[in-house]
Amino acid sequence: MASQGTKRSYEQMETGGERQNATEIRASVGRMVGGIGRFYVQMCTELKLSDHEGRLIQNSITIERMVLSAFDERRNKYLEEHPSAGKDPKKTGGPIYRRRDGKWVRELILYDKEEIMRIWRQANNGEDATAGLTHLMIWHSNLNDTTYQRTRALVRTGMDPRMCSLMQGSTLPRRSGAAGAAVKGVGTMVMELIQMIKRGINDRNFWRGENGRRTRIAYERMCNILKGKFQTAAQRAMMDQVRESRNPGNAEIEDLIFLARSALILRGSVAHKSCLPACVYGLTVASGYDFEREGYSLIGIDPFKLLQNSQVFSLIRPNENPAHKSQLVWMACHSAAFEDLRVSNFIRGTKVVPRGQLATRGVQIASNENMETMDSCTLELRSRYWAIRTRSGGNTNQQRASAGQISVQPTFSVQRNLPFERATIMAAFTGNTEGRTSDMRTEIIRMMENARSEDVSFQGRGVFELSDEKATNPIVPSLDMSNEGSYFFGDNAEEYDN
């Protein structure tokens, strides 16, 4: 990529830093996760959680959500201006699960947001540490991506539900900054832009006045983020058209949907990073490990090593399968919801099955669920190998893929062919090449038709033994090329509802 020199690595985005060398990046990412860990340890002390309770992923999620809510300025301001019954804008809380007389009981806790912010800042050398907050948001986003399908959201914006492999990060808040933008899939960006354009169509003042000027700046910035994800000149040129449109409307929506479809074959660059639940960093900090001194990377071996040595528990409902619950969380930890299952399988070293075959619902427990029947299990989050997470979509070629999901978005930088369902995808492109973007559309369709199944992505890249920390001996897995590996294959995952 020609523009590589101007890009910050997403480790730098993650920590809000300017360009740094590798050691500085490792130190600042280490400082970030160390701060999360210290915060978690302190919260466990505040809440008097036992060791077992502190390792419960549901408790971790509640604590993470509390700190995110405490720092959500826009929502806090909104709550103060629009007081709703029963919501104290100055407080935050959630369910904490404790072990009492051999049973799990739910306790709803409430804390001052001020107090939570104080504890967070104290754990982060007195700073706001927005990078750490974004990191937690990305972990929640990865968990959502793995747990839910976004069919309804796709249909609502006029996209095809089978394009779910493009929807990484679709539940990330807009305030997640550059690190959040880096992990958003092409479909997510398209969806955000379409929602914006639709508001403009329905509300004539949307683009007008001082507010409209800010809206316009946000629109162009989102267009540029999406443009930066595309790897071909024609796709980028089409994004320029969309961005420069005087009055964005249905023509732009058409163009964006066209571009989203094209990304199923001409994949965009979407960053992947392993973001772990706060309790994992907490356990590591509590054991005396110094993240900042040792350094840390979100895309290397470090998260794998952490998960090899961490015991995390989860509440489990009566008819759920602990192995399946573990798979769900493992995939979320490595941001592998849209990765080819053949690759995930090889790295994890245990069978990774499609979402529809998992006997498990989401990790979080609804407030009306009966705690009497709840049990807990150990999550098996270890792996057989590790691999570097990719920020590119890989080059493109063609293979059989499944009914429910017709393409993948690679997570691991591992040599393989990238499956997609050519016939299904191309069927959507019939006779729609008129209008001002016709030459670009024609060019994009030509490239898609020429994508070949022999092409291999991530040539020579492999997985590594966990003892191979410096990544010196890549093992290129032999994947069954006849088999495809879509996770949301013909699926019945629950919808994500805000």
Swiss-Prot record:
Residue ranges of region Disordered? 1-21
Keywords carried by this UniProt record: Capsid protein, Helical capsid protein, Host nucleus, Host-virus interaction, Ribonucleoprotein, RNA-binding, Viral nucleoprotein, Viral penetration into host nucleus, Virion, Virus entry into host cell
- What is the protein's quaternary organization? Homomultimerizes to form the nucleocapsid. May bind host exportin-1/XPO1. Binds to viral genomic RNA. Protein-RNA contacts are mediated by a combination of electrostatic interactions between positively charged residues and the phosphate backbone and planar interactions between aromatic side chains and bases.
Q: Could you tell me where this protein is found in the cell?
A: Virion; Host nucleus
Q: What is the designated name of this protein?
A: Nucleoprotein
HAMAP family with a match to the protein in the record: INFV_NCAP (MF_04070)
Cite the InterPro entries for this sequence.
Flu_NP (IPR002141)
Give the record's PTM text: Late in virus-infected cells, may be cleaved from a 56-kDa protein to a 53-kDa protein by a cellular caspase. This cleavage might be a marker for the onset of apoptosis in infected cells or have a specific function in virus host interaction.
Q: What does this protein do?
A: Encapsidates the negative strand viral RNA, protecting it from nucleases. The encapsidated genomic RNA is termed the ribonucleoprotein (RNP) and serves as template for transcription and replication. The RNP needs to be localized in the host nucleus to start an infectious cycle, but is too large to diffuse through the nuclear pore complex. NP comprises at least 2 nuclear localization signals that are responsible for the active RNP import into the nucleus through cellular importin alpha/beta pathway.
Q: Which organism is it from?
A: Influenza A virus (strain A/Equine/Miami/1/1963 H3N8)
The short sequence motif called Bipartite nuclear localization signal sits at 198-216
Pfam families reported for this sequence: Flu_NP
Report one GO cellular component: host cell
GO MF term set = RNA binding; structural molecule activity
